[in-house]
Amino acid sequence: MHGLTRNARDFAGLAEQIAATRRVIVPEMRGRGMSDYAKVSDSYTPPTYVADVEKLLAEQGITRFIAIGTSMGGLMTMLLAHTQPGRIAAAVMNDIGPEVDAAGLARISGYVGQGRSYPTWVHAARGLAEAHGAAFPDYDLDQWLEMAKRTMVVTQNGRISFDYDMAIAEPFGKPGNAAPPNLWLAFEGLRDVPMLLVRGELSDLLSADTVKQMGVRNPAMQVVTVPRVGHAPTLDELEVRAAITALFDGAA
């Protein structure tokens, strides 16, 4: 499950790897990618996304599953663990925890829903580099181009724009909608679940202290810290892929 402004393309490489041995479903939340935009923007909240996923699971007849969530998708993983106890066989949470740092939320609030567009892919890549260079200080132009093509599309007017409904910003700015104020109770649903936590070394959303507290509540939790990366790792890093493979191999 993807982040706030992201889509299924973030998981293309990882999904291909996992699909060699398991069934994979990579949903795009309402308002992103190929999913319909919501008629009412107030529905762009984590509880609504979780309800959508619960409906998808029911339609597909899925009773037990491994959850992978980046950022907002990790919040959804915790909420699912709370509302669907016993159904998560294992979990990968990418740069997110029960407490979300205010600095990271403020940064996201500064760009979500801005509606920027670009004339070429190179312009789009450079725009991303300008906005997110602090989180990925070692990225070169090719890597920024890859990120641009994951997050943007060519629109009908020929310009390149972000692949989500700009209206997701409307409820995001309201208290409690960006991230529920306290998800420690929901995280308890993952206490006995095999779990991998991925953290960007430079993350401004997931603090080292929160990681430590998560480890106290789930002593079996494995942690991989990706060096010189902020929010959020791509899950394509070699050390992350190896850890995910090990988690899946041990999941019942």
Task: Give, region by region, the residue ranges found by the protein language model.
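Active-site loop/oxyanion-hole signature of alpha/beta-hydrolase fold enzymes
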Residues: 12-20, 25-68
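Catalytic histidine-centered segment of alpha/beta-hydrolase-like enzymes
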Residues: 229-238
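Conserved alpha/beta-hydrolase catalytic His-Asp/Glu region
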Residues: 119-173
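Conserved serine/cysteine hydrolase catalytic core
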Residues: 153-216
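Conserved hydrolase catalytic core segment
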Residues: 63-102
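The conserved beta1-alpha1 loop
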Residues: 1-3, 199
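Short beta-to-alpha linker loops that shape the active-site pocket of alpha/beta-hydrolase fold enzymes
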Residues: 28-32, 97, 227-230
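Active-site glycine-rich loops that stabilize anionic/oxyanionic intermediates
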Residues: 3-6, 71
